[in-house]
């Protein structure tokens, strides 16, 4: 009887420890497993089809649908505050006009965000700090346009306890990354972006594998006629995960969201099955998630 109670006690503790693990910790365990067989989903600027891009609602929607990472863009205001905004100007995505760097945060907070159809909504421009607090423990964030002022970004990460939530990416050489970003390489995830259509793509990958051993590479190529695409996927297998973007047709040999709407096996399926892709950034996260569940890849 005591043995039975003991076994049930251990089982209870095990279940409790799994439940206590945050969603971010679960995602990180997959990111750091080069043999991971599930596919991680990245929502480009959040769920922008159903909420304004780079808004807290777009991020919340992505969390609720089960997305793993949201890609967001960071800009700096006149008074040095970091906000979410893709463009250097306010015109396209807000009710304001002019350059972000010429507006102070309090003034930007009086504006409303526009949706994908350029219609005014109730949503405000979020600060990076507000975003980090919404994401905390629930989803990871890929910060775009934040490289040049990452010292300030990192202060907010430490303040909010979200340093382990962040993915940074860039197309610089390994030497440049070590020189410019070196003090953060053991604190946040850094992924190289490699354009496979460029002459020294393979050497760049080899350099990063040798010196930094990144958890993943973001790869780009225009056409399946590129002879090294499959070679690179084979090289990275068991070493680093492969990330492709399906936002438009020139980013992944035409195997994009549009192709996937017509034939998902030729779009997403090709990237996953033929190129061993384990991270996909998409403008259609709900559609991709449904496909992955159907394929038992979630």
Where are these regions (language model features)?
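Phosphate-group recognition and catalysis centered on beta-loop-alpha active-site segments
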Residues: 20-298
